[in-house]
């Protein structure tokens, strides 16, 4: 009886351990897969530096285009679309962290003027919701509602990202005025080349850390290489570690120089930034403009009628 209870206890403990391990694995995988925007959030208080450079460029080294479309002007307390376009060749495949090839993901950061923010769900129209799809936006900081981030998300489905934006109302927010405002955007496609701690990913070129002769290249069991470089002058050895997924450009017995590329460049993605302008329009100014245009049209009509009346008078006088 005691033995049976012991086995039962052991079985329960094993089951509990497996369950806990599985939960930790799932949480870890989820945090890693959604970590890219968090890299910037954890390391930079503001994603846009004083020079105007968006900090995502510190990890995504290649330059690629990005575009943004916003209305020329919006009225207070209205919802509008900010469409970020991240174009790239959909046939391209990138090197994943496990060394295999896979589809590119995309991400974006949208820096709005103070007072502008993500529109609440109940203010978004069904048509706009259809354009947004299953995207989930988040604030860069809890106290920075005007800075939004998204990604990584599948690039083949979301190379165009629609942000639903709520315009502020100066009547309720005294810090907002009827002015022309700048909007800044950054967008990337594919993985970065450098992690926030300065270490390289396997999506970049690896260079020789020393000059000399390549005496040995060992292919590691789980992928990647160990390249041994020997300096002929003093027989000093240096071992360069190449992560999995990269293609070697060198071979054993080859003479190489310091900083010479050991691998080809696998990166097919890149980062770009752009800007746009939007006017927060005063409704009274719009009404005034409409009134002015209406008065001009009426004045033109009266002039035409007056001219016709004058011509009739002249014609009648000529008949006499």
From Swiss-Prot:
One GO process term, biological-process aspect: photosynthesis
Topology term for the membrane: Single-pass membrane protein
Membrane listed as a keyword: yes
Compartment(s): Plastid, Chloroplast thylakoid membrane
Principal cellular location given in the protein's record: plastid
Keywords annotated in UniProt: Chloroplast, Electron transport, Heme, Iron, Membrane, Metal-binding, Photosynthesis, Plastid, Signal, Thylakoid, Transmembrane, Transmembrane helix, Transport
Function: Component of the cytochrome b6-f complex, which mediates electron transfer between photosystem II (PSII) and photosystem I (PSI), cyclic electron flow around PSI, and state transitions.
Recorded family membership: Belongs to the cytochrome f family.
PANTHER family cross-referenced by the UniProt entry: CYTOCHROME F (PTHR33288:SF10), PTHR33288
Known partners and oligomeric status: The 4 large subunits of the cytochrome b6-f complex are cytochrome b6, subunit IV (17 kDa polypeptide, petD), cytochrome f and the Rieske protein, while the 4 small subunits are PetG, PetL, PetM and PetN. The complex functions as a dimer.
Protein name (record): Cytochrome f
Gene field: petA
